[in-house]
Amino acid sequence: MMTIDFIAFYNKVSSIALNFPGTIASTSYRTPAFKVGKKMFARFKEDGKTLVVYTEERDKWMKQDPATFFITDHYKNYPAMLIDLAMVSKKDLKQLLFTSWQIRAPKRLLKK
């Protein structure tokens, strides 16, 4: 997974995610992840260029740009979506990471 692209993608995601209260860099399923409290809210897939986030609006995102926002059968029954980090804008990535953080964050952090 350690490629030049992955390093750039990791830096892109971490520069946003680590600014949210209570966020730590961690791992999940042996890949880099970001957690709030003990809950993962974003993680890299094994390919190093796809990110998993939680969202309640995935249909909207996938309809808007199916090349960038998608799911696999594994995520069909979860409120999660995959993001192609080579395609996503920084604005959309920031919005999706923040929404995912809000879904997973403890209530005490949401008040900050």
Model-derived segments and their meaning:
Residues 1-112:
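Charge-dense, helix-prone N-terminal extensions
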